[in-house]
């Protein structure tokens, strides 16, 4: 009986340590959420502004032959895969890699330590990924697309729906899809629309990469906080159950000792 109570006491101590760890990680994630979601919203707004510029010129005759809106001759696809830098974020990383399996013939470009580990390639950290990193990638991708090295450029990332809901998604970057409601601008562009498109498309690919990295990081932080909240609740429930079991075992041991004492005194 004594050994049983000792085992229960050790288990309670172990689970309690886990509870402290999950609470600490949850607090760290909570402290990052506002900054991460603010960065996500700003990157969304900037991307929309760049897309508006492209949509305003892309329907012009000068842009009809642009390689960026033509279907590539190559059937090869290059896909950026954005995952987290760390684990303990629920199904965040697993959902990304599950979606990536749907493109077995693609060449993957990882962003985020876990993505680099998965594809066994060097990868920048998602949390510190910025504009300079994105524009370097964008220029490299555009050159490859223009040369016909691949016909599709895409990105696998996570969409932020709410604090409780994040969804893995695939977005095609190139060829650029002209929106159905896109209208030719009444503005006169100098020197012409084709030159504007050439400049804007680099900014588009750059800002789309930045937006998806920022949004994915916000999802990672939210998923980690949710996972830590859930783990914390499970740990608290386990501690309650173990404490109840411990008290019962201890009470049983005391009762047994009293019974033995009474029996001994009667003899």
Language-model-derived ranges and their functions:
Residues 1-267:
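C-terminal beta-strand-loop-alpha-helix "lid" module of Rossmann-like NAD(P)-dependent dehydrogenases
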């Amino acid at each position: 009986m004594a050994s049983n109570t000792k085992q229960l006491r050790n288990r309670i101590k172990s689970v309690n340590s886990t509870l402290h760890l999950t609470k600490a990680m949850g607090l760290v994630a909570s402290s990052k959420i506002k900054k991460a979601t603010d960065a996500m919203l700003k990157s969304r707004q900037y991307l929309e502004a760049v897309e508006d510029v492209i949509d305003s010129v892309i329907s012009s005759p000068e842009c009809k032959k642009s390689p960026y809106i033509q279907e590539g001759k190559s059937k090869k696809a290059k896909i950026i895969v954005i995952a987290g830098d760390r684990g303990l974020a629920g199904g965040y990383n697993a959902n990304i890699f599950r979606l990536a399996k749907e493109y077995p013939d693609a060449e993957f470009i990882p962003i985020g330590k876990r993505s680099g580990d998965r594809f066994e390639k060097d990868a920048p950290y998602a949390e510190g990924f910025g504009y300079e990193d994105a524009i370097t990638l964008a220029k490299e991708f555009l050159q490859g697309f223009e040369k016909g090295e691949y016909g599709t450029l895409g990105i696998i990332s996570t969409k932020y729906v709410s604090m409780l809901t994040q969804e893995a998604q695939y977005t095609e970057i190139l060829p650029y899809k002209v929106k159905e409601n896109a209208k030719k601008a009444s503005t006169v562009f100098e020197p012409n629309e084709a030159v504007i498109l050439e400049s804007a498309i680099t900014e588009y690919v750059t800002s789309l990469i930045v937006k998806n990295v920022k949004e994915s990081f916000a999802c990672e932080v939210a998923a980690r906080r949710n996972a830590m909240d859930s783990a914390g609740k499970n740990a608290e429930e386990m501690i309650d159950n173990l404490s109840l079991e411990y008290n019962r075992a201890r009470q049983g041991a005391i009762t047994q000792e009293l019974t033995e004492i009474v029996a001994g005194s009667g003899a």
